[in-house]
A protein has these predicted regions:
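Short, low-complexity, Pro/Ser/Thr/Gly-rich segments in the mature regions of secreted, periplasmic
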Residues: 516-531
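Intrinsic-disorder/low-complexity loop/linker signature
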Residues: 23, 32-33, 119, 499, ...
Length: 531
């Protein structure tokens, strides 16, 4: 969410930090409650010396994973983003472009983007108010305030002041939990979705903000059904592949269309008084205590409370990750915030669908060392699913490697993340993963390199591995070679314990001829996963 840039809100290091963006220098400083950015660039007139402009930091966006910063342009209330963002867990500045999965060199960030776009969901009732000389933007509240979910509160405040109110009285406020599952979910869907509006509606938004209010029918305000050919935000069958599209997935799920599942089936916006988790832990996903593990699913699918019934269905031990409903039916096949995110379209894993869409198969996101043929056979044996027609590579090479080596940038990012995911590591082992993460350290996409380096440090032997994913290419390639060397110097015995599906031969050597062949097949089209 967007907040005023106060000491409490700002998490980035502004203690006399200097950052470089090509031939432009940014000097960050902090005094009292004020944060400043001094921008020095070559003189635009061609004269010697530098042009220097100092602006305050007025707004921040983000508080869990990364944080962006905005400064006024001097054109009304228009703001422009600092071309760097702060990674909170890593405690470091990176170029903003490097924090997004987009083609190298795509650095465009026009002034006014916050006013005309981000204001929609990172504030409460944001109104761009675009004019010929800039924006005169206004908000009811920065961040996600009460009225974002409960609607306008004036009548409620007046009513509660005027008289004693009985429990069954009309409180003149929207309570999402008392709405139908469709209308309750639409409140979340006003932001957690991809949608379209007409040109006329967009013009109206730029002057008046969106007219939708909680409790209204969102379907009358925005179009959520559209062609799946929408850049790269969707897999080819229409399933969302980026974050902030959870409502799109939910409304296509049978649990929503045929049942009464809503966002509130799993999530709660106010931490319960009896929730013993630290507030920060709850706030990360805002899950109900009752929604952890399989408890959210067995609210309806009550038969699976019986562990015998559960294991007969999953063919996995009851307490294992393979018996966790969401690992099979809501796998991490969406991308956002430099990580993989669970899909919110509940699906049944089918090999044929994975092949047709390119969406990684849930089974192979845990069993990283297994082939599509292995998965296909198990699903046929257990559930009677029709077997798919598989290529020779799909029958002999681990599916994870096909996605990580020859897949598009989005697939490579997802697999780099899963190679660092503990449930997958516990099942598949880690001795063979190092070479493939090393390979991704030389990927042309910043985000893929970052995720790969983070996963690599979670593998034994790489805990202290030093690598800068935004260093010059020569340094990155040297880092990739160092990472590969660490693996090659480990005992041959450890490397030989893996089967041929992960392309390690009987001598414990990587089958580089096959890896190079897969690299030649890589889907290297420019791809931008807009979050």
């Amino acid at each position: 969410m967007t907040q005023l840039a106060t000491n409490e809100a700002v998490v980035g290091d502004f203690d006399n930090v200097t950052l470089h963006d090509g031939d432009v220098t940014y000097k960050l400083s902090h005094k009292g409650e004020n944060f400043w950015v001094q921008r020095e660039s070559p003189n635009s007139s061609g004269a010697s010396g530098l042009e220097s402009v100092t602006r305050p930091v007025s707004l921040t966006t983000g508080s869990h994973h990364m944080q962006a910063y905005w400064s006024p342009t001097g054109r009304g209330r228009e703001v422009v983003i600092l071309p760097f963002m702060y990674l909170i867990e890593e405690q470091r500045w990176i170029p903003r472009a490097a924090g997004l999965l987009q083609p190298p060199g795509n650095r465009s960030e026009p002034p006014g983007r916050w006013n005309g776009n981000c204001i929609r969901c990172h504030t409460t009732h944001g109104v761009p108010r675009k004019g010929p000389s800039g924006y005169d933007s206004q908000v009811a509240e920065f961040g996600i305030g009460c009225e974002a979910c409960h609607g306008p509160g004036h009548r409620h405040v007046t009513r509660m002041k005027d008289r004693v109110v009985a429990a069954d009285d009309d409180l003149a406020i929207i309570n999402p939990s008392r709405l139908s599952h469709q209308r309750a979910s639409q409140i979340c869907g006003q932001c957690h979705s991809v949608w379209y509006i007409t040109t006329g509606e967009h013009i109206d938004f730029l002057q008046n903000g969106f007219r939708y209010r909680p409790g209204d029918d969102l379907a009358k305000a925005r179009l959520h059904d559209f062609d799946a050919d929408d850049g790269y935000r969707f897999w080819s069958d229409g399933m969302a592949r980026v974050s902030a599209t959870e409502y799109n997935g939910l409304r296509e799920s049978a649990c929503y269309k045929q049942g009464k599942m809503s966002c509130l089936s799993c999530h709660q916006m106010h931490q319960a008084d009896d929730d013993s988790r630290p507030s920060a832990e709850w706030a990360n996903d805002q899950l109900q205590v009752e929604a952890t593990g399989n408890r959210a699913c067995v609210q309806c699918h009550q038969e699976y409370q019986d562990q015998t019934v559960l294991t007969a269905h999953t063919h996995h031990a009851p307490a294992s990750s393979g018996s966790n409903c969401v690992n099979c039916h809501m796998p991490h096949t969406a991308y956002g915030l430099l990580k993989a995110i669970r899909s919110h379209q509940i699906e049944i894993p089918i090999v044929r669908v994975s092949r047709e869409t390119g969406r990684p198969m849930a089974c192979n996101l845990c069993h990283l060392d297994k082939t599509m043929a292995w998965t296909d056979q198990h699903l046929a044996d257990w559930y009677g699913t029709e077997k798919a027609e598989l290529t020779a590579d799909e029958q002999s090479i681990a599916a994870s490697l096909l996605w990580a080596v020859r897949g598009d940038a989005g697939q490579r990012a997802l697999l780099a993340w899963h190679m660092g995911w503990k449930p997958a590591q516990d099942i598949s082992g880690t001795d063979w993963i190092g070479p493939y993460l090393s390979l991704l350290l030389d990927d042309r996409y910043d985000a893929v390199r970052f995720i790969a380096s983070r996963s690599l440090r979670g593998i034994p032997g790489y805990e202290k591995f030093q690598y800068d994913f935004v260093a010059p290419q020569s340094a990155r390639r040297a880092g990739s070679a160092r990472a590969m060397n660490i693996w090659e110097t480990r005992s041959a015995k450890a490397r030989q314990e893996n089967d041929r599906a992960v392309l390690i031969d009987a001598a414990g050597q990587i089958q580089m001829d096959t890896v190079r062949r897969l690299l030649l097949l890589r889907d290297d089209r420019d791809i931008g996963l807009l979050e």
